[in-house]
Amino acid sequence: MSEELGKISKPQAENVQLKKKLYLVQNIQNYFPGNKDFESLLKEYWDSISDQLDNLEKTAGNINFIYIEGMYQEYDVASKLLNDNNKWCLSTIESRVKSGSNYKKIENENNYKQLIDWTRIAQLGFVSENAKEVTEENYKKIITERSTIIHDELNRIKEGEAALFIISSGSHKFPEDMEIFNVIPPSLDKMNRWITENQNSLQDSNQEKEVQDEGEQDKQSGLWTP
């Protein structure tokens, strides 16, 4: 069952606090490094997420566990990776870890690395039907195993406990006895609009930069190019 934030009455809240709960947050990352406008929106998004989680914890229950899709590392390593790639997300979870929430890895390292490899192979395309069938078979097998790993980990959450799950995809199947809360701040719409409006100009800018970089490399190499 999925609840809408800000619309939980007191009797409902008391009932929800006794259940298993999962707070879902979309993992928006810095898709345009160096773009200050996008980084400002990104900060606004994660600040809004943090505020909504604060309110949700007061109503439905404190966060006992934190999971991040795609992370199989322990917290000391995971936090360093986040600091390099998504410091806004790190800020959101770091304060909660310091307050007592338990960060737990949601992925199995071997399974997740195989998923990455089979995904890359599948993206290359195939000449042979046999190779295509083998790849598809192994990809489906790894996906099924991963779904079981994630489901089993979430199923360890006990009644009355809550977990924050920062997700990158929407294809997960959650335990049926778990109350699901989708944390979606208005700033997400603003960010999506910005991406839509600026994507073409950003792509043109990146292509122009690539051409300039190639030109510089040609000059440095001393080779003549048409």
Enumerate the language-model features and the residues they cover.
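Compositional signal for N-terminal targeting/processing segments
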Residues: 1-226
